């Protein structure tokens, strides 16, 4: 979540849904988990699903939990609690095209001023 460029690359490659397995801890989770998922969804105008383990206070690493799904507008569509939960959320992938047409952030990038370079495996 902290590496915005990765999500931009995926969006430029046509991603409409990005599934992110992650486990923020109890320090960063409350402050950053939802904020970063909403920002990455909004920045790249795609759905993001953050899949986190449920919280286990007896574990060596205590996960913040709170799996969630954000839409291309950066709105939270579904969010789990800290306890084990099956999170189900209906999404319409055509919504990414509609949002990208309404606010063409990806097309408005100034690639004449900066480049995002990455190497693709062939």
Regions found by a protein language model. Give the residues of each.
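CN hydrolase (nitrilase-like) catalytic-core segments centered on the catalytic cysteine
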Residues: 1-87
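Cysteine/selenocysteine-centered motifs that mediate thiol-based redox chemistry or coordinate metal-sulfur cofactors
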Residues: 8-12, 96-122
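Residue-identity detector for threonine
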Residues: 27-28, 58, 94-96, 111
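Residue-level signal for alpha-helical context at structural boundaries
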Residues: 36, 91, 114-117
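A short, polar/charged loop-to-alpha-helix boundary motif
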Residues: 84-101
């Amino acid at each position: 979540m902290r590496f915005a460029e990765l999500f931009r690359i995926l969006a430029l490659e046509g991603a409409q849904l990005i599934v992110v397995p992650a486990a923020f801890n109890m320090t960063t989770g409350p402050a950053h988990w939802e904020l970063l998922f909403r920002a990455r969804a909004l920045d790249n105008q795609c759905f993001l699903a953050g899949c986190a383990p449920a919280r286990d206070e007896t574990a060596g690493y205590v996960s913040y939990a709170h799996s969630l799904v954000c839409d291309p507008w950066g709105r939270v569509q579904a969010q789990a609690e800290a306890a084990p939960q099956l999170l189900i959320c209906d999404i319409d992938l055509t919504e990414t095209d509609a949002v990208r047409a309404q606010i063409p952030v990806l097309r408005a990038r100034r690639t004449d001023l900066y480049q995002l370079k990455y190497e693709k495996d062939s």
